[in-house]
A protein has these predicted regions:
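Conserved double-stranded beta-helix
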Residues: 1-52
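Conserved hydrophobic/aromatic beta-strand scaffold that supports enzyme active sites
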Residues: 5, 35-39, 88-90, 98-100, ...
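Feature marks short, surface-exposed loop/turn motifs that line or immediately flank catalytic pockets
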Residues: 10, 44, 59, 127-129
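Short aromatic-enriched loop/helix-cap "lid" or pocket-rim segments at secondary-structure transitions
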Residues: 14, 49-50, 62-65, 132-137
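Short, surface-exposed loop/helix-turn segments at secondary-structure junctions
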Residues: 21, 74-85, 117, 135-145
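A short beta-loop-beta micro-motif enriched in histidine and acidic residues
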Residues: 22-33, 86-87, 93, 116-117
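Double-stranded beta-helix
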Residues: 43-110
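Non-heme Fe(II)/2-oxoglutarate
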Residues: 98, 104-184
Length: 184
């Protein structure tokens, strides 16, 4: 277990989550990391369900810094031209629907223009041999808890590079919404 969070997309204009990949926020030694999402309410297409670009987990990792070297938490407009955004699959369903995406998968969601909120419970898990590179979740009550199997004696390293986020110990870690909206 790596971490969990409750993501509320409020009704009547809840913020857009721009296209991004998760692994750059909390890099690991390899890419055997996934996120499970559980919709806590019924979610229909008007509520801005999460959209996933199929197959994008096999593509490149994108830089989430802008041209002035500021962390934005989203893929640049220029890099988005490399993706088939029209192929996005939007994951709606009744309360209890489970979504699963790999840490490299490009995903995002539009503003929620419905009157209903869209709560999404997210839990990130990694293989025991996929070790966190940063200490973003270290010290959490359940962080790095082995849910199945046993602790790894050997770490597995992927030969592909992974972008490092800012040093969260020197800056206040903000939510993806704050990073993407350039809030202070």
């Amino acid at each position: 277990f790596h971490h969990s969070k409750l993501n509320f997309k409020w009704g009547d204009g809840g913020e857009e989550v721009k296209w991004h990949q998760d692994i750059q926020f909390w890099p690991h030694t390899n890419f055997e990391v996934l996120t499970l999402g559980v919709y806590l309410e019924d979610v229909d297409p008007t509520m801005a369900p999460m959209g996933i670009i199929p197959g994008s987990h096999n593509g490149p990792l994108f830089d989430l810094y802008d041209e002035s070297d500021t962390w934005t938490g989203n893929i640049s407009e220029n890099d988005l031209t490399l993706l088939e955004l029209d192929s996005a699959e939007y994951l709606s369903g009744p309360a209890g629907t489970v979504t699963v995406h790999n840490c490299r998968c490009v995903h995002g969601s539009a503003p929620n223009l419905s009157s209903r909120s869209r709560p999404l419970f997210l839990c990130a898990y990694s293989a025991a041999h996929a070790l966190p590179i940063t200490d973003l979740t270290r010290g959490g009550k359940y962080s790095e808890t082995i849910v199945r199997g046993k602790a790894a004696r050997w770490a597995k390293f992927d030969s592909r590079p992974v972008l490092l986020p800012p040093d969260w110990s020197k800056t206040r870690h903000k939510s993806i919404f704050e990073h993407q909206q350039n809030e202070n």
